Curated annotation (Swiss-Prot):
Keywords: ATP synthesis, CF(0), Chloroplast, Hydrogen ion transport, Ion transport, Membrane, Plastid, Thylakoid, Transmembrane, Transmembrane helix, Transport. It comes from Piper cenocladum (Ant piper). One of its GO terms (cellular component) is chloroplast thylakoid membrane. Its main location: plastid. In plastids the F-type ATPase is also known as CF(1)CF(0). It is found in: Plastid, Chloroplast thylakoid membrane. GO terms for molecular function: proton-transporting ATP synthase activity, rotational mechanism. The chain crosses the membrane at residues 27-49. F-type ATPases have 2 components, F(1) - the catalytic core - and F(0) - the membrane proton channel. F(1) has five subunits: alpha(3), beta(3), gamma(1), delta(1), epsilon(1). F(0) has four main subunits: a(1), b(1), b'(1) and c(10-14). The alpha and beta chains form an alternating ring which encloses part of the gamma chain. F(1) is attached to F(0) by a central stalk formed by the gamma and epsilon chains, while a peripheral stalk is formed by the delta, b and b' chains. This is ATP synthase subunit b, chloroplastic.
Length: 184
């Protein structure tokens, strides 16, 4: 057992400055650690993220449907206003001599009110969609960050044990001893 431990300590030995060596300490190589963490994140986070995005998509679609219904109601109001406008125009032809300018004002007011109402509803729909999209993006970001953090902590906790700490400490002590001998 001591020979096995010594071989691992010698494999994890860091070369001195100015020399070339191959680092076989798996825990000290970042690309392997990063690929393991990313693999775990992708494997475990894929389903949760897709469910979250599907739920978000359904909420956004329902908001769009509600906005479309509001738009339909506004178009219906606009049609009613146009019908009323046609009625007013017929009455305007009959009473042109008595109140042409007032009828024109009423016509403009009706058109402006209907247009403003439609524009206001369209703006509300667009603001609602943007708000829901931003909210979905923020929730996804937060969820991914939490999952990444939990995965990294889980990986670290599963990799760290007492024997590994003792080997790292003894390796570092031998490196410091060798450096002290070189400096003396």
């Amino acid at each position: 057992m001591k020979n096995v431990t010594d071989s691992f300590v010698s494999l994890g030995h860091w070369p001195y400055a100015g020399s070339f060596g191959f680092n076989t300490d798996i825990l000290a190589t970042n690309p392997i650690n990063l690929s393991v963490v990313l693999g775990v994140l992708i494997f475990f986070g894929k389903g949760v993220l897709s469910d979250l995005l599907d739920n978000r998509k359904q909420r956004i679609l329902s908001t769009i449907r509600n906005s479309e219904e509001l738009r339909g109601a506004a178009i219906e109001q606009l049609e009613k206003a146009r019908t009323r406008l046609r009625k007013v125009e017929i009455e305007a032809d009959e009473f042109r001599v008595n109140g042409y300018s007032e009828i024109e004002r009423e016509k403009s007011n009706l058109i402006n009110a209907a247009s403003e109402n439609l524009e206001r509803l369209e703006n509300y729909k667009n603001e609602t969609i943007r708000f829901e999209q931003q909210k979905a993006i923020n929730q996804v970001r937060q969820r991914v960050f939490q999952q990444a953090l939990q995965g990294a902590l889980g990986t670290l906790n599963s990799c760290l044990n007492k024997e590994l700490h003792l080997r790292a400490i003894s390796s570092n002590i031998s490196i410091l001893g060798a450096m002290k001998e070189i400096m003396d």
